[in-house]
């Protein structure tokens, strides 16, 4: 942890997530980075777009400037006023304390580059750490390692997707089918459909145990 090397002041940093924020993705990445360094932050749900309240530490402020993230330094009195506003039962707001950076996995083929996938592109830009995992890792029991698994609009039927009717005779499509069947066989499954079913069941079972 870098916490003990940070110089602190008697104030807090508000990272707004409304239209005042220059870079929302980088702001989320900054929140993740802060949690990685074992510093607890407050997530102000429905307050200015779901803003973050972070201890005013010199190293954090330097990081905010480096990443060109909009922020405000607030005195304790200003912070208390905001929290009182959020606590009003007439408003739909809440303070959620965040203590730990989640371990994130994205279900995506290992040969897909970050810029070919919208989710990994966003996470890479935001500087949020993630692992790419795919079928073999899931059927071998890796899911308990992660707090959050991102799925796209996946087809777990093993039917090779929406291109079957138009591209099934194309060489690139047939090669993809062969690769998929070979990967399934290597893992001990009789077909891609059987492998995809096992993957889907692993994901479902992991979700039900959380």
Regions found by a protein language model. Give the residues of each.
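Aromatic-Pro/Gly-enriched surface loop or interdomain linker
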Residues: 21, 26-30, 36-39, 47-56, ...
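Conserved small/polar residues in nucleotide/adenosyl-binding loops
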Residues: 207-209
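Short amphipathic alpha-helices in soluble, non-transmembrane regions
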Residues: 60-73
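A structural signal for short hydrophobic beta-strand segments in well-ordered beta-sheet cores
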Residues: 41-43, 71
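Short N-terminal segments immediately surrounding and downstream of signal-peptide cleavage
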Residues: 10-26
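Trp/Gly-enriched beta-strand/coil motifs that build multi-repeat beta-propeller-like domains
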Residues: 45-47, 66
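N-terminal signal peptide c-region/cleavage motif recognized by signal peptidases
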Residues: 5-6
């Amino acid at each position: 942890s870098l916490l003990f090397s940070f110089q602190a002041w008697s104030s807090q940093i508000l990272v707004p997530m409304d239209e005042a924020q220059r870079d929302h993705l980088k702001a989320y990445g900054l929140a993740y980075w802060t949690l990685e360094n074992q510093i607890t932050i407050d997530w102000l749900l429905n307050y200015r777009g779901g803003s973050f309240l972070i201890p005013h530490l010199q190293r954090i402020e330097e990081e905010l400037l480096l990443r060109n993230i909009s922020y405000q330094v607030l005195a304790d009195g200003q912070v208390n006023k905001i929290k009182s506003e959020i606590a009003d039962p007439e408003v739909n707001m809440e303070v959620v304390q965040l203590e730990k950076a989640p371990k994130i996995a994205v279900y995506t083929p290992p040969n897909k580059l970050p810029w070919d996938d919208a989710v990994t592109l966003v996470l890479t830009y935001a500087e949020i750490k993630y692992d790419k995992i795919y079928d073999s890792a899931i059927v071998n029991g890796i899911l308990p390692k992660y707090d959050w698994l991102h799925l796209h609009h996946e087809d777990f039927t093993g039917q090779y997707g929406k291109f079957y009717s138009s591209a099934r005779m194309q060489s690139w499509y047939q090669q993809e089918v062969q690769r998929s069947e070979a990967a399934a066989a290597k893992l001990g499954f009789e077909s891609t459909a059987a492998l995809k079913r096992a993957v889907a069941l692993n994901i479902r079972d992991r979700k039900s145990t959380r």
